[in-house]
Amino acid sequence: MIEKHIVLEDIDPVVFYGVSNGHLQMIKSLFPKLRIVARDNVIRILGDEEEKAKIEEDIETMRKHIVRYNTITEEDILDIVKGRKTKADAVKDVLVYSVAGRPIKGRSENQQQLIDAFDKHDMIFAVGPAGTGKTYLSIALAVKALKEKAAKKIILSRPAVEAGEKLGFLPGDMKDKIDPYLQPLYDALEDMIPAVKLQDMMDKHIIQIAPLAFMRGRTLSDAVVILDEAQNTTPAQIRMFLTRMGWNTKMIITGDLTQIDLPHAEKSGLKEALSILNHVEGISVINLDKKDIVRHKLVTRIVNAYEAHDKADKR
């Protein structure tokens, strides 16, 4: 009999084998005609040829499940081996699972529209107040595309202008000055990708995070590209960014038109782009509002209070 070797690629073997090898022992019990030996990320199988073909197919399904969701349960394994409906079929609305195992998916009608728009359009503008999940959901869509090999890399960017601070007046070298502006993007990625794997992807430039100015002169192909806080771009900056789009690339531009930190005389590039590109074929504009806020319930009350204050000021 020929021994079959299966390599667990793109996943943490510990997740596959389970706590105290619980998953592995379960798989062995489901295939009593086979001798199964696991070492690191390689599984060696000896025994009945038909059973070997079946387990190879099932292990690949389990591997893909872990790639997408970062986790797998004994119930999932049983469903896969027994040919019942898998978790992947049952929760198609889940984009990815967080490192902690929490499902990440659209939680409102407008968030679902953003997800649907990503499937149908190459460029999406997601506009709405703080807490509506526009950035987090966009990054989840990018991570999903990367895991499913629909994209080769993720590129995340922000304009380095916020809260009235000028980079030249901040202490430290350029990295020290820039990193605080990009931290929300790191936070979202760390929630979805294990730390060691994330660092490896960044070292290999599979995931890139950079200020908007670093995009100049580049053509961004085979990627999901996200521009966050786009309300703080100038018209020239956002025009430069949008024209970086290359083949097999999707762009998501997020922003909140109520939080523009540009000097008063400067026009928001996002505001101008929305008025110019609103009806261009291939571009989708998704407007999120306070009904989509998924942070602490106080955030909704704060947004409502400021909206009322702004309306009173205009009278």
What are these regions (language model features)?
Residues 97-227, 231-315:
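Conserved helicase motor core of SF1/SF2 NTP-dependent helicases
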